[in-house]
Design a protein with these regions (language model features):
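Bacterial N-terminal signal peptides that target proteins for export
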Residues: 8-23
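Bacterial N-terminal signal peptides
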Residues: 22-32
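Catalytic loop of the DD-peptidase/beta-lactamase superfamily, centered on the K-T-G motif
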Residues: 33-81, 179, 186-187, 191, ...
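Active-site helix/loop module of the DD-peptidase/beta-lactamase fold
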Residues: 50, 66, 96, 101-105, ...
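Active-site SXXK
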Residues: 55-58, 69, 75, 98-126, ...
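Catalytic nucleophile serine of serine hydrolases
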Residues: 104-106, 160-163
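Carbohydrate-binding/catalytic loop surfaces
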Residues: 205-247, 251-253, 299, 304-306
Length: 371
């Protein structure tokens, strides 16, 4: 791989595209030649090892200062690592326990909370969203349509990825759970499955009086200790990282959760073990939304769902100007890839919102490795 290449905003886009294509093709050719075609499960460790050997080259190509990664199989971490730096200036290495802003992977937590409300009989997905809140862009849209990114224009007619509209689900979670969104995340997900290095909002490093009242002092102390280790935010300019600003530090249904790849591996295991909801409810969440035309959307209920060379993929990405993330589940193979970065390099150059995870070189190489 062309490990020495760097990207900069002023570079020719076609040159960047060719560089990425060369990097991805190199990975795929090497993986495919070593393990042609579908392979028995016993070869998985070798295929995963081959994939991980190329993560550093992909990180450099993407302009990511620090990358943390974990791969799970059947509920357990089989590989984890950190590449580059969580703090470039202080030379603090990225690690599996490094906290990051996970951006829109937060949306999958929103899906989980709402589906828990459905199971408890406290939420009707097909009720107008105005039933639960008045702060909505389209009061005639249903909760399901907003959760499925299909509330734009004529509700239910088109898919359009829109994080701002998704935020309308924040008060819906509060209405059906009886507590604020951040408390619901903490109680129903983080505390429930032991995600001790995750925090429901970076603003809890200096909480308001209202936020302080929602958590006991010991919990707030733990949150502050986690946030003291959070990766620094960077933008990549002229081939190098420049320290920048953190995204807005609050949390809502669309973004704001802080976590680590280890904690997200716990989340992944809990999903697969149906700790957070029943298998039948999870199936509903992972069923692509059917648009008014009858066509399936690439988005289900808070998750992307599609077919790949490795079978079905259930996934989500996240993107801020200074952070990015990817959680890619391949249920037919029983494996999951989790990536967190302190720049936008995992997401910004790839049209992931269109619903094809394979446009990501990281995802494409992983799919080829485990297919």
């Amino acid at each position: 791989l062309a490990a020495g290449l760097r990207f900069s905003p002023g570079s020719d886009k076609r040159h960047l595209r060719r560089a990425w294509q060369g990097a991805v093709v190199s990975v795929i050719v090497l993986v495919s030649c070593a393990y042609p075609g579908a392979q028995p499960a016993g070869d998985r460790e070798h295929r995963i090892t081959l994939f991980t050997q190329y993560l550093e080259s992909l990180r450099i190509q993407a302009g990511i200062p620090g990358l943390s990664a974990a791969i799970t199989a059947n509920g357990s971490i089989i590989w984890e690592g950190g590449l580059g730096f969580a703090d470039v200036e202080a030379r603090v290495a990225a690690a599996p326990h490094t906290p990051y802003r996970i951006a829109s992977i937060t949306k999958t937590a929103t899906s989980t909370l709402l589906m828990q409300c459905v199971e408890a009989g406290r939420l009707n997905l097909d009720a107008p969203i105005r039933t639960y809140t008045t702060t909505v862009p389209d009061p005639n849209a249903t909760v399901r349509q907003v959760l499925a990114m299909a509330s734009d224009a004529a509700a239910g007619s088109t898919y359009r990825y829109d994080g701002d509209r998704f935020q309308a689900l924040t008060p819906v979670v509060a209405a059906c759970s009886g507590v604020s969104y951040r408390v619901a995340v903490a109680r129903q997900i983080l505390d429930r499955i032991g995600m001790a290095d995750s925090v429901p909002g970076q603003d809890l490093e200096a909480p308001t009086e209202a936020a302080s009242a929602e958590f006991d002092p010991a919990t707030l102390t733990r949150y502050r200790a986690v946030l003291a280790r959070i990766a620094k935010p960077y933008v990549v300019r002229d081939g190098g990282p420049t320290l920048s600003e953190y995204p807005p530090k609050g949390i809502n249904a669309s973004a704001g959760l802080v976590s680590t790849v280890r904690d997200l591996a716990r989340y992944d295991a809990a999903i697969d073990a149906h700790v957070l909801m029943s298998s039948s409810t999870q199936l509903v969440a992972w069923t692509p939304f059917r648009l008014a035309s009858g066509r399936e959307s690439p988005y289900a209920l808070g998750w992307f769902v599609q077919s790949t060379a490795a079978g079905r993929a259930v996934w989500h990405y996240g993107q801020w100007p200074t952070f990015s993330s990817l959680m890619l589940k391949l249920p037919d193979r029983g494996v999951t890839l989790i990536l967190l970065a302190n720049s936008d390099g995992l997401s910004s150059r790839f049209p992931l919102a269109a619903g094809d995870v394979a446009v990501s070189p990281f995802a494409h190489a992983f799919i080829q490795a485990v297919r």
